[in-house]
């Protein structure tokens, strides 16, 4: 046996290499899947951050147990949770109130302790040691005049409902603290400072007070409703794929067994996030490698078949010497299976090395390298498939009669086995059809191109030889010798069919893999662009809408492309968010695809310019002629204004009475010395239900500090007359402004300057409204604003599939305040480079605007790339490269095993009188045609397979409604991948043809040497 292997070293090496590739695919899949799982865990833990990943246990004191302290809670921590946690941080806390200064209302405050807190504070004074001692923040000390020795009182609850009211707890200040900003793993988002002086909107805007830090002794005999808290920071080094699920399970059990204990769900949320990715990894990675393994087994079968064909004479000789069919089978299979077995260890080592390389290129650094036990069944399966492939390759030869074995080529070799081909085509076709119709779905759809390519390749291998023979006969009639020889060669040589099948499958895998990777990347980038809106989104700290607009204008003046944006989040999660933008600059800064199709011109401000009030004193002549029914005071004419800071102001300028008609001269101070915008005019009426007032009010010569106001122009005012007849119609003539009013039930009526559209036009997405509908949305001030739907769109930048887009400049003219509790004030930047962002910060700082964190599209895209789907699909590129390598190996093996027969045929042709040019051209054409046809068919299979497979492949761990996935082929990538495969395989085919031609000798026609 060993002598036979040495005699055909090339074949033995080829069998061993292909067997190694089968084993490589089998071992690499579970090893790399495990690595992706490790990376998912790392990403989830790192992205969560210490404060989100920590588990908090909180137990409140009750009437029956009013002395709970942190050690009791710490004793409940299960071992599995403690195993993945750092040292616990414990403490007591009680939400109460304190009077910061005499005469002020009580402010809410938290009295608390924390493990080793004084080691994490900078204290002027000393740390609390006795009951009732506290340290206060430096901000509170400065704001309220607190200092060492200051005494404060905080109330406490009754221990029992009918117990007497307990005395307040007296606290003594013994120090002033500052909390450094560089210890996030200690505070875990629960910092004691940052609240001082901030108004509390839930409690009459009383100023906030930072936490009061005390010692645990303060809680021993006081505060019967306080809570004992234990926080367990996650230890990233201890959190593994095995330990973290155990910790999550233990946490769930702890909460079920202790209903009074509040248990954080951070461990469970991390496990759920990792598990979602693992579900995808467990399917995507194996299927990517399984289709490559299928090709490897197919190649092994073809290589073994070629090796068997070369041993036909040896099998015949063994049979003639008295060996039975079984004995001949044993000799042949032993010689062929031995290289296959020798290739398995090489495949294991190759898989591990490949995993190391791919991990370093795709996954985060410093991941633990593990070889899971799941490798064993995969390796065993690879061994069985490899041996089965060799057996099936040898079986037809072993069943042939001795007479047929004495021939170099089997009588049916040119046609192949119709039964085998039919079975392969039917099975592969059914698989591809099942995926196309949805009967088979999921990530297993990755196998669609391979199954389709196998079916097409086998059919083509059946049809192409007949077409080649037909072409050869036609070429012969036309005297085209080279084409005739090439056609007959393709028609009669089994190697041509084998090359065609392998090339088709390899090309399909390579082109599909490249296309799938790029299509997935494009969709991830599209989602990141939609969710961020612009290349860079910078948070800014402003309290007024004009400030936000001025900040963007300042950036624009300095050459920084920027657009102001405010995103307003409603209180209810079911309501649509509002995004207020500058329609003039958004299109220049936002990602083009996110604003494509948005009619931003519809949001543009009207042609009417704002009317500025150039002074303080308003003068005019006012006449009225009114009819009133019911009781009530005389109506009042008021001027509505907006201050430069965006605040709304109203000043009464005339009383329209006491008579039903009359005239008066006004000379009133508007109290707007900084210059205001004229927003509108209103008539305030009074009266009981059923009362009515109507008539006209005429204003002539309206001036401010002697300067006429341009209020009588055409289309300056907006009529507010409703369908019920109430409201104001405005008419102008000369310097006269006539208001035709109608009001009922004592309601006020008003008219507006037309510099702001009312209702505000809006672009809506998934709001349950139709084009032209009017409804209310939350505006930048946290109030309700009427909007009219100008158009419905599928998606909006930043708010994605559910939101309303309105004009920020329009809102700024009527709404100055920003509701900071619900509004994200942002500057969108076109330049996301570090230099561009730093330049924007410098300009904003010069304008007195504080800038905050910056979110970039690149970062958002990177988050999606660092997912099971992202990493798993990138593996398709590796599979495509290996597939082309396998196809090249088949070309080499078939050339090595068949060159003697080819040289003998060519030598016979030369002796018969054919020229060298015709012979060499025929051989090159024979080699190139099979490869070229396989490449074209494989590309077609890849495109059809993409249409079938891509809709079933998860592009994201968490799917989104928008943007709608664009699964159309990435044509440039398809062309590049096809060209790359063609360049490699066609060039290799030419090289092999040249190598065979160089071995051409005329004496080879006498017979093949053995």
Regions found by a protein language model. Give the residues of each.
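Alpha-helical transmembrane segments, especially those used as permease/efflux helices
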Residues: 10-15, 22-28, 217-225, 238-258, ...
